Amino acid sequence: MSEFSTVSCGGYPTVSDTFGAALWSIDYAMQMSVVGYSAAYLHTRERNVSYNLFDYLGDGVDGWITRPIYYSYFPILQGLQSYNGSRVVDLGLNDNSTAGYGIYDRETSELYRMILINFKDGNGPVDFVIPATGSPRAGGGKNATVKFLTATSIHEGSDISWSGKTWKGVLDGMPVVSGRDADLTQMDISASYTLKIPSPGLAVVMFEKPLPSGEPSGGGNSTNSPAGSNGSGNTTTTNNGSALSAGAPMIVALGAVFVGALVLN
């Protein structure tokens, strides 16, 4: 695709320069991957345009600020990079505030990444239930690493964290420790696992060792994750008729969707 962004001809203040725009950009890019686009240009323009990736301050201040949409590049890169090529499947979550994508190895058809998006604004985390069974997973399906993209609000313009790092208050382009939502490493997913994604926020779930280019400079902090738990709630349906659960706090179960998604490959 030649170009895309939030609002044509430069964006719109309070829309294009928010964390919500970053999540939207990721969701849109993944939708393009689902239907077969191989590349796209996330548009940016001259200084002080609302949907820019970053801006030179000028006016006597020597430095650059990083805008929210720049953060969208990292989950997309981390999710789609592969050795053999990728096949992306929309998991069909039947909810306006969540989205999920399974990313499969084009040669082996193993599920090796997921991107899970929570668009809710500050109402507590959403629980995404990762089942013990379903499509074959890369790395044997026993462990996973999770990287988070989060912000304090869907309207936030600077206090954003990716993989435990942020560009908030940074003028030299080098990220610093954000102090929140660090990576989860070596998650035991041999049993059903409940992944809590902050509101708003996004998680990239990796079932095998990530390639190095998805890291901000300096890498992210890591912690060991607690054991997962089963979720329960009221039953709704996905777009392909598979069951998922939703409750309060909201729970999204992904098990049956994986089986259906693998057939599409």
Range-by-range predicted roles:
Residues T133-S199, S222:
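Acidic, Ser/Thr/Pro-rich beta/coil linker or hinge segments at domain junctions
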Residues L111-Y112, I117-D121, G179, D188-P210:
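Extracellular low-complexity, Gly/Ser/Thr-rich intrinsically disordered linkers
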Residues N240-N265:
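Cleavable C-terminal sorting propeptides in eukaryotic secreted/cell-surface proteins
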Residues T6-Y101, T108-E110:
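Aromatic/acidic polysaccharide-binding cleft in carbohydrate-active enzymes
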Residues N48, N84, N96, N143, ...:
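N-linked glycosylation sites
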Residues M206-N240:
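C-terminal low-complexity, Ser/Thr- and acidic/Pro-rich disordered "stalk" regions positioned immediately N-terminal
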Residues S2-S5, L42-E46, L116-K120, L149-A151, ...:
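Active-site-proximal beta-strand/loop segments in catalytic clefts of secreted hydrolases
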Residues L93-G139, V146-S153, P200-A203:
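Carbohydrate-binding surface patches
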